[in-house]
Amino acid sequence: MSEPLKPRIDFAEPLKEESTSTFKAQQTFSEVESRTFSPAAIDEYPEDEGTAEAAVDAALQPKRSLWRKMVLGGLALFGASVVGQGIQWTMNAWQTQDWAALGGCAAGALIIGAGVGSVITEWRRLWRLRQRAHERDEARELLHSHSVGKGRAYCEKLAQQAGIDQSHPALQRWYAAIHETQNDREIVGLYAHLVQPVLDAQARREVSRFAAESTLMIAVSPLALVDMAFIAWRNLRLINRIAALYGIELGYYSRLRLFRLVLLNIAFAGASELVREVGMDWMSQDLAARLSTRAAQGIGAGLLTARLGIKTMELCRPLPWFDDDKPRLGDFRRQLIGQLKETLQKNKPTPEK
C-alpha cells in the first residue's frame, strides 16, 4: 500500500535572490598619480615561519640586570689592576736587575696572553655560531626576492665556509646551471637543490650511525649509569660532527650554547611533533609485544639521538628547509627497528639438533 502524500508547507518569507558579484567602478589615474603609484605590500612570509626560532632566540637573550653590570665592571677593573701591577713589577725588576722576578713577570705575561687569546678565540667561535642564524635569515630573504646580484656571492660564501672545493661535481653542476638572467631567488634555489644536499646527506649518515649505536648500546647494556654516560658522550660528539660538516667550528662556550639551543628548540617544538611523526605508526606495529623491554628502551634512546641530530642540522644549516628535503623522524625509526631486529636475530642462539 502506497504511503499518503505529505501536506503542503507554505513559507512566510520569500525566496532569497541570488547575490551577484558587483565590480567596482573604473578608476583612472592621472600621469602624476601613476608615477607615484606603489602596489600594496603583500606578506610573503607565513605567520608561523620562524616562530620557534624567534622564541628560542628570545629565551637565550641574557637579561641585563644591575648585578650583571656590577660583576662585569668589577672584572674589568680587576683586569686593569693586574695589568698595571704587572707592568710596575716588570719595571722594578728591570731597574733592580732582579732576573728571577723578571722571569716570573714574563711567565705571568705569557699565561695572561694565552688566556686572552683563548677568550678571543671562544668569542669568535660563539659569534660565528650566532652569525649562522643571520645567514639563514638572509637566505630566507633571498628566496623571496626578485633582485639580482647577491645570490651568487652568498652561495659561494656558503660553499667556502663548508669547505666545498671548486672542482666538486655538485658545485660544478651549479655553476653550469646558473646564468646572468636569473635572479637571486633562482640562484639560491639551485644551490639548495644541487649543492646543499651533499652536506645534508653526510649529516643524515652521521645521525643514522650515532642513533644506531645508541640503540644497540642501550639494548645490550645491563648498566643504566653506563648507558647515560654513553648517550651523553655520543650526543655531544654528534653535535660536533654536524657543526663541523656545516662549516662551524665549536669552542667550549659555543658548544654549550648550541647544545642549549638544540634542547630549547626541541622543548619549543613540543611532544606533538613526535606523536605526529612516530606515535600512530609505533602503536600500529605493536612493538611492545614484539620486542623486549631493553630493546624498546634502545629504540627510544636512538630516536632521541636522531631527534637531537635533526634539530642540530636545522640550527647549523645555512639554508631553511624545503618541504621535501627536511628529514623525518619516522625514516630513522624504520631503520633503527630493522637494524635492531637484525642484531637480535644474529645473537639469538640456534637450537641444537
Swiss-Prot record:
Give yes or no: UniProt keyword Cytoplasm: no
- Write out the annotated subcellular location: Cell inner membrane
- The record's principal subcellular location, in a coarse class, is membrane
For this protein, the parts annotated as crossing the membrane are: 70-90, 100-120, 213-233
Domain of life of the organism encoding this protein: Bacteria
**Region of interest (Disordered), ranges:** 1-29
Q: Where is the composition biased (Polar residues)?
A: 20-29
| Gene Ontology terms: cellular component | plasma membrane
Q: Where is the composition biased (Basic and acidic residues)?
A: 1-19
NCBIfam families documented for this protein: hyp_HI0043
Name the family. Belongs to the UPF0283 family.
Q: What is this protein called?
A: UPF0283 membrane protein YcjF
Please tell me the species this chain comes from: Salmonella arizonae (strain ATCC BAA-731 / CDC346-86 / RSK2980)
Q: Which gene encodes it?
A: ycjF
